[in-house]
């Protein structure tokens, strides 16, 4: 959304809070709202994902995480059809979907992580590296490399997504739909 939807982040709410605060301090109230609404949409996405997890925790036919991924796919698919005159609504919807992703997928291989941002992963990886340097614990090194691997994959995806968004425009978000669908299908296969 930053590249094709008026320079507003959907996954990095810290950036939106910084930019919103700057505009508030400058007295530019309308521009500040431009950054506030995606933050609120993100918060609402966390609430909805948490509610889905609680409500469908014991569902037998489909795992609650698959429900969240299917909702994300539908949201992102719709956003790809939205013209740029609806950038604020599109950014809010993507923020909502990103929040659902972050709330739903909080661990990988037993380690807590953030799927749509890097700061927590960088902190955890570097903390583990420090433990390895200090105590020579091989498990700490594995953990550090795990987090740095997540950051590398994130960076490759972000870079590819940025290039695609510059080349394809708002429709580049549909690539995310394909990747999410593949992930959902892998989750179904894993359950069987």
What would you call each of these model-derived segments?
Residues 60-66, 159-178:
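A membrane-interface helix-boundary motif in multi-pass transporters
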Residues 31, 35-39, 43, 147:
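Short hydrophobic/aromatic, small-residue-rich stretches within specific transmembrane helices
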Residues 46-61, 165:
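Helix-to-loop junctions at the C-terminal end of transmembrane segments
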Residues 39, 43-47, 151-159:
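Hydrophobic/small/kink-forming positions within alpha-helical transmembrane segments
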Residues 61-70, 90-93, 114-118:
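Cytoplasmic-side transmembrane-helix entry/capping segments in multi-pass membrane proteins
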Residues 67-74, 171-187:
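Symmetry-related core transmembrane helices of the 12-TM Major Facilitator Superfamily/SLC fold
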Residues 72-87, 188-191:
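C-terminal ends and interior cores of transmembrane alpha-helices
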Residues 1-32, 101-145:
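Small-residue-rich hydrophobic segments that form or flank transmembrane alpha-helices
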């Amino acid at each position: 959304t930053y590249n094709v939807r008026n320079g507003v982040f959907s996954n990095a709410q810290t950036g939106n809070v910084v930019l919103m605060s700057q505009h508030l301090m400058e007295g530019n109230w309308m521009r500040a709202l431009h950054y506030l609404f995606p933050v609120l949409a993100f918060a609402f996405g966390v609430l909805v994902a948490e509610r889905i997890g609680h409500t469908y925790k014991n569902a037998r036919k489909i795992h609650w995480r698959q429900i969240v991924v299917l909702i994300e796919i539908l949201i992102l698919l719709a956003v790809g059809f939205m013209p740029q005159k609806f950038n604020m609504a599109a950014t809010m919807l993507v923020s909502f979907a990103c929040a659902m992703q972050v709330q739903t997928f909080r661990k990988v291989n037993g380690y807590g992580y953030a799927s749509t941002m890097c700061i927590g992963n960088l902190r955890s990886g570097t903390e583990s590296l420090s433990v390895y340097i200090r105590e020579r614990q091989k498990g700490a090194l594995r953990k550090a490399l795990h987090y740095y691997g997540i950051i590398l994959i994130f960076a490759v995806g972000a870079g590819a997504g940025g290039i695609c968004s510059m080349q394809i425009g708002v429709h580049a978000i549909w690539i995310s739909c394909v990747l999410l669908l593949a992930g959902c299908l892998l989750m179904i296969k894993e359950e069987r």
